[in-house]
């Protein structure tokens, strides 16, 4: 079965919008109140959003590495987020 291309709505949505929608999907799925078919549709949409988000993050990481590599004095280091 060939892979489906990401739907246009996902591509047009910002990362933040997609993340918000994904959080809402998780909440609905965790409630356990959706009929099976609706839950499967929500799950499918969630997987699409998660994959798109992963791709967006990968592209952002690559852009940062490219920007840092333009400065020969800036060593590449693994990104570690601030923990508060």
Swiss-Prot record:
Show the InterPro entries listed in the entry.
Exonuc_VII_S, Exonuc_VII_ssu_sf
Q: Enzyme class, one word?
A: hydrolase
Please give the HAMAP family that the UniProt record associates with this protein.
Answer: Exonuc_7_S
Under Pfam families, the record lists: Exonuc_VII_S
- Catalysis performed (reactions): Exonucleolytic cleavage in either 5'- to 3'- or 3'- to 5'-direction to yield nucleoside 5'-phosphates
Q: Describe the subunit structure.
A: Heterooligomer composed of large and small subunits.
Q: Which domain of life is it from?
A: Bacteria
Gene Ontology molecular function: any one? exodeoxyribonuclease VII activity
Q: Which GO terms describe its cellular component?
A: cytosol; exodeoxyribonuclease VII complex
Keywords (A to Z) from UniProt: Cytoplasm, Exonuclease, Hydrolase, Nuclease
Organism annotation: Yersinia pestis
Main site of residence?
A: cytoplasm
Q: Please state where this protein is localized.
A: Cytoplasm
Q: Which residues form the signal peptide?
A: none
Gene Ontology terms: biological process: DNA catabolic process
User: Could you identify this protein by its name?
Assistant: Exodeoxyribonuclease 7 small subunit
Please report which protein family the annotation says this sequence is part of.
Belongs to the XseB family.
Under which EC number(s) is this enzyme classified? 3.1.11.6
Q: What is the lineage of its organism?
A: Bacteria, Pseudomonadati, Pseudomonadota, Gammaproteobacteria, Enterobacterales
| Record function comment | Bidirectionally degrades single-stranded DNA into large acid-insoluble oligonucleotides, which are then degraded further into small acid-soluble oligonucleotides.
